[in-house]
Amino acid sequence: MEVEKSKYRSEDLDVVEEEADLKKSRRDRDRSNERKKDKGSEKRREKDRRKKRVKSSDSEDDYDRDDDEEREKRKEKERERRRRDKDRVKRRSERRKSSDSEDDVEEEDERDKRRVNEKERGHREHERDRGKDRKRDREREERKDKEREREKDRERREREREEREKERVKERERREREDGERDRREREKERGSRRNRERERSREVGNEESDDDVKRDLKRRRKEGGERKEKEREKSVGRSSRHEDSPKRKSVEDNGEKKEKKTREEELEDEQKKLDEEVEKRRRRVQEWQELKRKKEEAESESKGDADGNEPKAGKAWTLEGESDDEEGHPEEKSETEMDVDEETKPENDGDAKMVDLENETAATVSESGGDGAVDEEEIDPLDAFMNTMVLPEVEKFCNGAPPPAVNDGTLDSKMNGKESGDRPKKGFNKALGRIIQGEDSDSDYSEPKNDDDPSLDEDDEEFMKRVKKTKAEKLSLVDHSKIEYEPFRKNFYIEVKDISRMTQEEVNTYRKELELKVHGKDVPRPIKFWHQTGLTSKILDTMKKLNYEKPMPIQTQALPIIMSGRDCIGVAKTGSGKTLGFVLPMLRHIKDQPPVEAGDGPIGLVMAPTRELVQQIHSDIRKFSKPLGIRCVPVYGGSGVAQQISELKRGTEIVVCTPGRMIDILCTSSGKITNLRRVTFLVMDEADRMFDMGFEPQITRIIQNIRPERQTVLFSATFPRQVETLARKVLNKPVEIQVGGRSVVNKDITQLVEVRPESDRFLRLLELLGEWSEKGKILVFVQSQEKCDALYRDMIKSSYPCLSLHGGKDQTDRESTISDFKNDVCNLLIATSVAARGLDVKELELVVNFDAPNHYEDYVHRVGRTGRAGRKGCAVTFISEDDAKYAPDLVKALELSEQPVPDDLKALADGFMVKVKQGIEQAHGTGYGGSGFKFNEEEEEVRKAAKKAQAKEYGFEEDKSDSEDENDVVRKAGGGEISQQQATFAQIAAIAAAAKAAAAAPVSAPVTANQLLANGGGLAAMPGVLPVTVPTLPSEGAGRAAAMVAAMNLQHNLAKIQADAMPEHYEAELEINDFPQNARWKVTHKETLGPISEWTGAAITTRGQFYPTGRIPGPGERKLYLFIEGPSEKSVKHAKAELKRVLEDITNQAMSSLPGGASGRYSVL
C-alpha cells in the first residue's frame, strides 16, 4: 500500500510538474509576445517622433514637448509594469502556497530577476540611443544655423562690396567735379588777373592812350589765341599719329579733341566779348569821371579865386569807384580817402613821363616816374609796370627817409582844399608809415613811441585794476529788452477739477491746517489731494507710479496748482519735504507747451543752486522725468569738465541746472555764442537764501536782468530769513508765499540730542555712537573746517573705522565719487563740512552728528535735515562746549520750535551767555544771513579805502597832500635833494646828540648868539619834510653848547646834500601784481618779457614782495607781490609801466575769455 501510495504520489508530482511547466511555457510565451508588441509599438512611436522632429526641426520647443510626452508615457508604462509585477508576486506567492517545491519558486524568481535586468538594460540602451539621436538632431540644427549665418555673412559682404563700389563711383564723380571746379576757378582767376592788368593799365594812361592800349592788347590777345590754337592743333596731330594702330580709339580721341577745341574757342570768344564790353564801359566811365572832376575843380577854383584851379593834366592817374575788385574778393567800392592817398603818393611829373614813353614806344630803362617803354609794348606785364612806376619809387623814398614831393592841388579831394599843399603829403606819408610799422618786418616788437601824450601812460593803477579785473557780473553785458521782440508763451495750464472746486472755504482752510500750510497772496488756488488733479500728462503720471509716488506731499499740494497757474512763488518748507518735485513737474509741462529747442537756442527752464552737489542732485531728479518726455537737461557747474557742458549746450537743451558763477562764464565765453537766455521763460532758484548769503547777489541779478521780464520765477528753500526775502521779492512779480510748518523749523520726525562736552571728550563719544548706530544705517558727521575734517578722518582711520571725507578743498571729481560711494553703500560713514548740508539726499541715513556746533541757526536746520527725509525717522546729536556758548541760544531755539526737550545744561549755558550779552561782556551772535558776499557799491568802496588808509598809517606811511589813493600811482624822483620825514627826524636826533657831546668840550666864549641859533633852527625847520624843533634860548654861559649844536646840524645837512649830489638822478615806480591770475604774474616776472621792455625803455625792473592769496593780509613790514621800476628819466619809467600794464591786460583778458576747466582743489586723485 505504501508503495502504491508513493507511486501515486510520484505520478501526481509528475502531473503537477508538467502542469507547472505548461503554465510556465504559456507564461513565457505570453511575456515574449508582450515584449514583441512593446518593442513594435516602441519602434512605431520612435518612427512617429522622428517624423515629427523632421517636420518641426526648426523649433527646439517641439523637442521639449515630445520629450515631456515621452516622459509621461514612460511613467505610465512604469506604473503598469509595477502593477503587473505586484500581481506576479501575488500569483507566485499563491503558487508557492499551492506548490510544495521551493526550487521552482526560486528558479522563477531568478528568471524574473533576469527578465527585469534585461528589460532595464534594454531600457538604458534605448535611452542611450535616444540621447544619441537627440545629439545628432542638435548637431544637424547647429550646422543649419551655421549655414544660415554663412549665408547672411555672404549677403552682408556682397552688400558692403556694392556699397564700396558705389562709394568709389561717388568719389570718382566728386573728384571729377572738384577738378572741373578747380579748372573753372583757375579760369576765373586768370580772367580776373587779366581784368586787373587791364584795369592797372587803364589807370596809368588817359582817355586817348587807353584806347590805343586796348587796341594793342586786343591784337596781342588775338595773336596769343591764334598761337594757342596752332599749338593745340599740333598736339592733336601728334596724338593722332601716336595712336594710329587703334582706329577705334583714334576716332574717339579725335571727337574729344574737336569738342574740347570747340569749347575752348567758345570760351575765348565769350571772353573776348566780355573784354570788349568792359573796355567800352570803362572808357565811358573815364570820360564821365574826368568831365565831372574838371567841372568840380573849375567851380571850386572860381569860388575861392585860387590860381591853382587849373584843368587836371592829361596823364593824371584815375580811380574809379566800383572797379577795384580783384582775385582776393575785396569790395568793389573804393572810398574817397583811399583815392586821395593813392593820388598823393604819385610824383608830380608822373603823367608827362608816361606820355613821352608812349609816344616814343622805346626807352633805355624804366624811369623812376613809371615809364612803360623799356621793351615792346606787347611784352610788358602791366603788374610789373605798375610796381616799377608806383610802388618801388615810394619804397625807395621811404627807405631814404625823404619826404614825398608836393602834389598839385588838382589831384586833391574837395574836402582837402582848405589846407596847405605841403601838409597833405605829410599826412598821407604818416598813414603809410603806420601801416609799415605794424607789419611783420619790423626788427623789434618795441619801437620808440612817438606820442608822449598817450593816456595809458598816465592811467591810474586803481582805474587800471578796475578796467582789467572785471567781476563775473560785470563781464555779462546788459540786454535792452525793449529792442527785442520775444515770442509769446503760455503760463497758465491749471484747470481746477470738480472735486476741488466743490470744496467750501471752510473745508479748504481745514485741509490747509491739517497739512500745516500757510499761504500769503491774492487769489491763491486751492490745494490738490491727488496727482491726477494737477493736469499733468499721462507719461509723467506713469513715471510717478513707477517711482512709487503715491500721494503729493504738503508743499506739493499747494505749490503745483500755484505754479501751474503761472504765478510767481516763494516756497518755504522743511528739509526732505519734496520741494524739488514741486517745481520740476510744472516746469516740464511748461516746456512741452513751447516749440522744440534747436541747436543754437538757449534753454527754456533755468534752475540755479548755490552748490555743485545740489546741482547734481536736482539734475538726477529731473532726469527721472525728462527722459520719458524727450527733454534734455544739462548740469553746468564749476570743477568739472567744461568741454562736455559746452558741447551739450551747443546742441541745444531745454533745461539748464547751474551755479551762478559758471553760468556767467558760459554766457561770456565766445561772445555769447555757446548759449543765451533769450528763450528762458521759467526761472527757479533753489536754496535761494543761501545763494544770496554766499555773495551771489550780483551774479544772480545780472543773470535775471538778461532774462525776459515776463518770465515765471519760483524760489524754494528750507530757511528764508526776512532780510533775504526782501532781496528776493525784487526779482518776483506779485508772488504767492507758501509756508509749511514753521518758517525755519527742523522736521519733527528727527530726534534731536544736544550734549555739552569739551573738545577732548568728543572723539570717544563719537566712537560710542558709531558702535550703537553703525549696524542700523548710514552716519554723517559734520565739522566746522576743512582742516578739522582731514584730522578727524585720519583719527577714524587709525581707529579702524573705514570712512569718507568731503569738503570744498577737494577736487570736483573726488567730491562726486565720494558722494556716489556714500549713496551706493561702499562706505557708511561720511565726515563732511557744511558743503554737504544742502541738497544731499541719501537713503537710509539714520544718524547725523554735529561734531562741531553750527555757527548759525539756518546751518543747523540744514545739517540736521539730512536725516528723517520723506517721512522716515532720524536722529541728530550735537556736541557743544562752553567755548561755543554763543551758539547755544540758536540750539535752544531750534529745540523749542520743533517741540523737542531742552537739556538743562544747554539751557544754563544759553542763559549764562545772554546774561553776559546784557552786561556788555559778550556780543550776540548773528544769524549769518546778513550777506557775506561783496556788495560792489560806493559804501563798500569807502570802507575799503578807509581801512587801507588806517593800515598805511599803522605801518608808518603818511599820505601825500594830493588825496591820492595809492602811493604807487605816481612816478617819483628817487635819491634827489628831498629828504624824507623819517630821515630828517633821525638827522635832528643825531645832531642834538652830537651837540650834547660837544657842549662839554666847547669854550664858553663861543661867538654864537641866541639869535643866530634861532635863525639856523628856523632854516632847518624850513627844510622840506623836516619836523620843526623848538630850540630854547640859552643863557650866555651856554653859548659854546649852542655853537656846537649848530655846527652839528650844519654838518648833517651838508653831508645829506653831498650824498644827494653824488647820486645820479633817477626815477622809480611800483606796480602791484599780486591779485592778477597766475599766468599773468608769471608772464610779467619772466625774463623773456622783462628783458625786451628794459632794453626798449632803459628802465630796470625787479620783482619784490611776496605772493599772498586772496583774503590773507600781509604782516607788519611785509608787502604783496609787486614790480619795482627804476629808470634814468620819468619818461622811461612811464613807458615801462605802461608796457607792463599792457602785458597784464592781454594775459588777463585771455584768461577770462577762455573758460576754466575747473578750479583745482588742494586734493586730487593720483
UniProtKB/Swiss-Prot annotation:
Changing residue 808 to R: In rcf1-1; loss of function and reduced cold tolerance. Residues 560-738 form the Helicase ATP-binding domain. Residues 59-70, 101-110 have a biased composition (Acidic residues). One of its GO terms (molecular function) is RNA helicase activity. One of its GO terms (cellular component) is nucleus. Residues 1-12, 21-45, 111-206, 224-314, 344-357, 416-426 have a biased composition (Basic and acidic residues). A motif (Q motif) lies at residues 529-557. This is DEAD-box ATP-dependent RNA helicase 42. It comes from Arabidopsis thaliana. The gene is RH42.
